[in-house]
């Protein structure tokens, strides 16, 4: 004898299952599918309002732009992160490290944060201490990012066409760092070895060997740079290390062990390559940027005063020459007049 469930029975079973918690997949399969006609009871006003909600004609569906590299890998994301950091960071120091442990990195970052927090903030300037970071980078990917920033200009990419939701063609520019234009620009630029060696990348490329760490500053602040050098690469008397009495944690064995494995090899400041001496010069600017501006103003004023004195000296010398010539001519004429005057007196 076969059991057959009528439609009302099935509906009743479905409502019973909906009201209770479904604990198995077989019970879930017993729930009948809901008809789409149940959702067609919207009011005419809502339908009219929905008709006005339409996409603009120039809307391009969000699709992945064409790329020369796989975009879903960690290497691609690191490349885009490094290129963005290179374009937005005006001051960057490059270090080579030798197998520092996590505890040593933590100790070094602790002392670095302490030294940076003691730097006085100029009046009216933001505090950049919390935005100064010391991080380890992937050397090979960072090298590619540096080449991309150096040899690829996104503004030179000509726009192409993209299909909108309505099927029309609109101009679109694919100039991201993973695009084929970036790959071709880097490939063409690196063919000429002699030209590459004269660029900033050619000067920094020999430093990107082995494990690399970078210190990034969001602005060119000689005061913060000097504080960082006193911790990471001290060189007295310009950048002496903190005293043991003032900062005993700096002389902790873990911190000192990590600092011995850290070597400053160069830097990139305002898009230019700097060696160790150049970095020390920037960090030694007195009173920071304001002091540099004062030196520049003084130099310009001195040059202007020198030019004014030179021009005035030429005019004065010409005037003295003319005056001396006039006096000579007067003396040549005055003796005759004096002789005539004496004769008149004798008469």
From Swiss-Prot:
One of its GO biological process terms is: translation
Q: What are the protein's UniProt keywords?
A: Mitochondrion
What is the purpose of this protein? Component of the mitochondrial ribosome (mitoribosome), a dedicated translation machinery responsible for the synthesis of mitochondrial genome-encoded proteins, including at least some of the essential transmembrane subunits of the mitochondrial respiratory chain. The mitoribosomes are attached to the mitochondrial inner membrane and translation products are cotranslationally integrated into the membrane.
The places in or outside the cell where this protein is found are: Mitochondrion
List the source organism.
Neurospora crassa (strain ATCC 24698 / 74-OR23-1A / CBS 708.71 / DSM 1257 / FGSC 987)
User: Where do the record's region annotations for Disordered lie?
Assistant: 55-74, 325-347
Q: Which family does it belong to?
A: Belongs to the universal ribosomal protein uL10 family.
The terms describing its cellular component in GO are:
mitochondrial large ribosomal subunit
InterPro entries, from UniProt? Answer: Ribosomal_uL10-like_sf, Ribosomal_uL10_bac_type
Spell out the coiled coil positions from the record. none
What name does this protein carry?
Large ribosomal subunit protein uL10m
On the tree of life, the source organism's domain of life is Eukaryota
Molecular functions (GO terms): structural constituent of ribosome
Q: How does it assemble?
A: Component of the mitochondrial large ribosomal subunit (mt-LSU). Mature N.crassa 74S mitochondrial ribosomes consist of a small (37S) and a large (54S) subunit. The 37S small subunit contains a 16S ribosomal RNA (16S mt-rRNA) and 32 different proteins. The 54S large subunit contains a 23S rRNA (23S mt-rRNA) and 42 different proteins.
């Amino acid at each position: 004898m076969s059991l057959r469930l009528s439609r009302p029975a099935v509906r009743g079973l479905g409502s019973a299952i909906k009201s209770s918690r479904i604990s198995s997949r077989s019970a879930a399969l017993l729930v009948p599918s809901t008809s789409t006609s149940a959702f067609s009871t919207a009011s005419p006003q809502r339908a009219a309002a929905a008709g006005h909600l339409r996409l603009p004609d120039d809307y391009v569906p969000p699709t992945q732009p064409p790329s020369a590299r796989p975009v879903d890998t960690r290497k691609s994301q690191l490349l885009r992160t490094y290129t963005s950091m290179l374009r937005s960071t005006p001051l960057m120091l490059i270090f080579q490290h030798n197998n520092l442990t996590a505890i040593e990195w933590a100790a070094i970052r602790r002392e670095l944060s302490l030294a940076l927090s003691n730097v006085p903030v100029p009046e009216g300037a933001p505090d950049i201490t919390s935005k100064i970071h010391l991080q380890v980078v992937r050397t090979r990917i960072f090298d590619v990012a540096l080449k991309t920033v150096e040899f690829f200009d996104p503004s030179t990419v000509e726009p192409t066409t993209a299909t909108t939701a309505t099927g029309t063609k609109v101009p679109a520019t694919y100039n991201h760092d993973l695009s084929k234009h970036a790959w071709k620009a880097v490939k063409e630029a690196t063919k000429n070895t002699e030209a590459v060696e004269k660029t900033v990348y050619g000067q920094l490329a020999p430093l990107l060997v082995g494990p690399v760490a970078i210190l990034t500053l969001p602005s060119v602040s000689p005061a913060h740079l000097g504080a960082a050098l006193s911790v990471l690469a001290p060189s007295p008397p310009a950048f002496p290390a903190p005293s043991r009495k003032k900062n005993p944690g700096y002389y902790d064995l873990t911190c000192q062990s990590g600092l011995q494995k850290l070597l400053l090899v160069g830097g990139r400041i305002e898009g230019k390559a700097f060696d160790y001496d150049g970095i020390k010069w920037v960090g030694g600017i007195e009173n920071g940027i304001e002091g540099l501006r004062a030196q520049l103003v003084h130099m310009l004023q001195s040059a202007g005063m020198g030019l004014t004195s030179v021009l005035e000296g030429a005019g004065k010398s010409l005037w003295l020459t003319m005056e001396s010539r006039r006096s000579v001519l007067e003396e040549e004429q005055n003796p005759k007049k004096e002789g005539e005057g004496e004769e008149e007196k004798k008469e």
